[in-house]
């Protein structure tokens, strides 16, 4: 059967071009697989990690794209942070406060401290990477309420203070920005108190003894009657 002139011409051109190989269907499939992008993974971001690099910087610095947690609008004040562990050092009169970042854009944090029913004391501001801070100058035996506040260009998060709900709840961890803080008395203070109580008891005992002897000297002691001898 005679071949078509066009087909013969195509075969001739293919054989004349050096390095030309016929296309194989498997090669096309391999090229398509190589160009398929890998699925994105979550960024190494922890809301509670101290000195945590912002997630947007992790996206730019990483070799591959990663996913950041969703955030609220930057045009709104941030959601309240979540207060974490509070470690008290009674000997030093200080406490270390830990918190977790909210799912909101944050520029800075600070702590508010209430003692009794007085006005809150505002601590220094910390940048958005900080998740841990110290409270100093706490009184031994004092009771406080501490709140974490987050702020951005649109405003600051709400800090209910001593009137917050769930401060005294024992059902589970505190999920709000505030918590109660109690500083136990120092060991030396307890020792001094014990010595004071012991001294007071000793003084009271001595006073009772002196009073007893004074009464004996004043009224005299009752004399016992001599025993009567019966018979010779």
UniProtKB/Swiss-Prot annotation:
The keyword Signal applies. Residues 1-22 form the signal peptide. It is found in: Membrane. Keywords: Glycoprotein, Membrane, Signal, Transmembrane, Transmembrane helix. Residues 211-232 are cytoplasmic. Glycans are attached at residue 127. The keyword Membrane applies. One of its GO terms (cellular component) is membrane. Residues 23-189 are extracellular. It comes from the Eukaryota. Residues 77-172 form the Fibronectin type-III domain. It is a single-pass type I membrane protein. The chain crosses the membrane at residues 190-210. This is LRRN4 C-terminal-like protein. It comes from Bos taurus. The gene is LRRN4CL.
